[in-house]
Amino acid sequence: MLTVRAASRRADFCAGRGRIYGETQEARLVGNQRTHIMKILIACMPATGHLNPLLAITRILLAEGHEINFLTGSVFRARIESSGAKFVSLQGAADFDGRNILSVVPELKDIPPGLEWFRVAIERLFVDRIPAQHQSLLQAVQECQPDVIVGDDMFFGVLPMLLGLRSKRPPIVLCGTSFLHLAREDGAPNFLGLPPATTEEQRRQYADIAREYDEAVDQPSLLCLNKALNTLGVGPLSAPLFHSVVELADAYMQLSVPRFEFPRQIPPSVHFVGTPPIIPGQAPLPPWADELDGSRKVVLVTQGTVANHNFELLIAPTLTALANEPDVLVVATAGGRPVETIPCAVPSNARVASYLPFEWLLPRVDVLVTNGGYGSVNQAMSFGIPLVTAGMTEDKADVNLRVAWSGVGVNLATNQPTQEALRAAVRTVLDRPAYRMRASQMADEFARIDTRSEILSIINQVVVNQRVALWADTVTTSGPRRAIRQR
């Protein structure tokens, strides 16, 4: 039986705070508008953090009766086919297993975190894949004849299409599966976890840092990118890779809410659509499910599905740090890896599992301890869960910076926090109501967005816009000739 606290959390969920995909939807309706059935091609990087939100969007589209072809890595064939979409495999260098980027780009193992690591990751993981991604995309378009392409923001194989004639391609909608990759108002470069400048001195410091970042990362990777684009007959680009796709997409769906982004000028093509619904039934209930009855505070710790090769970074120290907290039940998920790989004894107040059903779990969680995966952070916020974050790799420094900046949690700003720091941070978030209050306000903002309707409306609108533009071009070019013939 649920306690008052747990029952309240469930009531919040039922009222729309937190999103879980429902099997019963109003078929083919967007607001009061009936949509046409479309052929939609999904294009996705073969990495779990990109795949999960695109699969959730796929299920929304399938429920509307749309025909979905899903282009991604062969390692995810079973997941795509089980969703009801038709699987289309990436080819050549584009078909890799992004669940372990160190196996994809082995040289990153020998490069310490820093600017050189970012440059190599951008060039080897993203730029080098563009020709094969683009060729795979062209083949899929030829075979599927889609009305629209929906891609994740790091499937850069769409760039040659975006740089070509719009009339020669389907409309392209991209999904922001990371923080919004636009230039910052204070001039700070992205990916370094720098807080918004509050003084002119900070702005001057950021200008110096930006020059160093531009010389070490942006310019070399842009040179590499433009060489690749030149071989495909397009380009060059003048803006950095991640920034360019935001500006070039016909529509860009940021999978979050405005409150979680720094204030800045945002193009009208960018739409905040909330977080995609959790797909239910991905894992069974654990045998200890009844223990999450609200009698103890539940702390969930996860390292996600990418940076989970070393559980000594976060999961093990969190389990040990909270072992003597009598009012806390710690739940750890291994992101699909065997629980035996967790390198510590499991304390009596902890429960572990390889996978857990998040649609059941999140309404019962009081604090999430995470390395800062964008999808996990946004899902937690949509349920009003405050956070403790510790991660500096990939995009995590900037994601976790936003956690602290928005007031929904504590950012430890390190890849390997100490047990003492973890315990203090968790107790701070549990014991100070301000964090839960800010997380609750964030959940309210998520609840105000009808994610399903927004996604359907945006995709439908870009298709309509494309048809109108093509019709207008036809009228403009053929109108006078028709008039002459009518004489």
List the predicted regions and their residue ranges.
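N-terminal subdomain of nucleotide-sugar transferases
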Residues: 37-91
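Conserved nucleotide-sugar phosphate-binding/catalytic loop shared by glycosyltransferases and other
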Residues: 70-118, 202
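C-terminal amphipathic helix plus adjacent low-complexity
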Residues: 419-487
